[in-house]
Regions:
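RNase H-like, metal-dependent nuclease domains and their acidic two-metal-ion catalytic environment used
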Residues: 1-44, 50, 54, 67-134
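Active-site proximal helix-loop segment of RNase H-like, two-metal nucleases, encompassing DDE(D)
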Residues: 55-64
Length: 134
């Protein structure tokens, strides 16, 4: 079901890359690659998570994120604890919660890929409309 949904999104949008957490994603990665998508591993540690987490927090504070008040996303965001390392890096974490945060971590990963492989020009669609969650 998820792969078919991603395929339909690929028909509507120019999906350049799909980031994935290496844990337990082997079959889905192979299937998405077989469908022609470029998939890239994305670590869940401070090194990979800190820059896009900081950027997303900045966009939220600037009120440049539109999520439509989605109740599941809101619930997952409420489950997040922002962990900080001694160097000042941050990342979303469940701390000791057993509740889900995946839907709140996915936009962090997607934002990183949008920044890394965004437009070739210096202009960004996010400069005018902000970040949109679908």
């Amino acid at each position: 079901y998820i792969e078919k949904f991603i395929a339909r999104l690929g028909e509507r949008f120019n999906i350049r890359e799909i980031a994935f957490d290496r844990w337990g994603a082997v079959q889905m990665v192979q299937n998405l690659e077989g469908m022609g998508f470029t998939v890239v591993p994305f670590g869940q540690g401070f090194k990979d998570m800190s820059p896009p987490t900081k950027e997303l927090m900045k966009l939220v504070l600037e009120e440049r994120v539109a999520h439509g008040g989605h109740p599941v996303l809101r619930w997952m965001i409420d489950n997040i604890y922002i962990r900080t390392d001694p160097a000042g890096n941050i990342k979303p974490d469940k701390e000791k919660s057993t509740e889900k945060i995946d839907g709140a971590v996915a936009p962090v990963m997607a934002l990183d890929r949008a920044i890394c492989c965004g437009n070739d020009t210096s202009e960004s669609v996010y400069d005018n409309r902000g970040l949109l969650f679908i």
